[in-house]
Amino acid sequence: MTRISFYYDPSCPWCWITSRWLTEVQTEREIEIEWLPFSLAIKNGELGGEDITGHLDTHSIAHRVLRVIEAIHAKEGIDRGELFTEFGKSYFIDPKLDDDNFFQATLERLNLSVSYLNELDNTDHDSALQQHIDDAVEIAGDDVGVPLIIFETSDGERVGYFGPVMRRLPTLERGLEIWDSLVVIATGPDFYELKRKRARRSKVKTTKRLFPELTKQPQ
C-alpha cells in the first residue's frame, strides 16, 4: 500500500488532470489518498482583492468552494476527494453549468442541503485552510503550488513534490506506467527534482471520458 497526500485547488486545470489520473490509477494499484485543500487565493495573497497572478476571479471562486468542502467534510463526514470530484465535474466537465449555478447543482447532485451555500462567504474556515497550506509548505517548501503530492520515502521521510503536471489525461495503461515509475523515484532517498518548461496549455476536457453520464448527447 502506497500512502500519499494530494493537495488541490479546485480551479487549477493541471490539478484536476493529475487528480483524475490518480483516481483512475487507484483502481489498479493499492493507493491510499488523503485529499487536502490548497487555496491558491491564500497562497498568493489574493483574499484582499489584489490580482497578483492574473487569476483572481478563478482563485476566488475556488477558495469559496474550499470553504463549502470543509464545511461539508466536517458536518457530513464526506471525504474531501469525493467532494472535489463532484465540484470538479460541475466546473470542468458539465457544459450546461456556468459560474452562477454550479454551486447549487453540485449540492443537489450530492443530495445535500442548499443551505451549504451560506458557507461560501464564511471566513471562519479560512484559518483551517491556511493551516493546510502551512503543513504542505513545511514539507515541500514555500516555492510550490498544486498539484502537490506528499510521499513517504524508503527512509521514512515525508517529501513533497510539485506535480506530476500532465497536459492531458493519459490512457489507463500509460497512467499506470507513470505511477509505477513515479513511486520508484519519489520514494527513493536520492531523487530531488525534475522539471521542464511549461509551453503548452492543459487539455482538461480529456478527463471527460471518466464521466460519460455528463457527456452523453440527448437522443
Label every model-predicted segment.
Residues 1-24:
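Local sequence-structure signature of Cys/Sec-based thiol-disulfide redox active-site neighborhoods
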Residues 8, 87, 165:
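Short, histidine-centered active-site or binding-site loop motifs used for metal coordination
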Residues 9, 91, 119-120:
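Short, contiguous strand/loop micro-motifs
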Residues 10, 56-57, 170:
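Conserved aromatic-histidine-acidic binding/catalytic patches
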Residues 11, 76, 122-125:
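Short beta->alpha junction loops/turns
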Residues 16-103, 181-185, 193-197, 203:
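Structural alpha/beta surface segment adjacent to cysteine/selenocysteine redox centers
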Residues 97-219:
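C-terminal cap of thioredoxin/glutaredoxin-like
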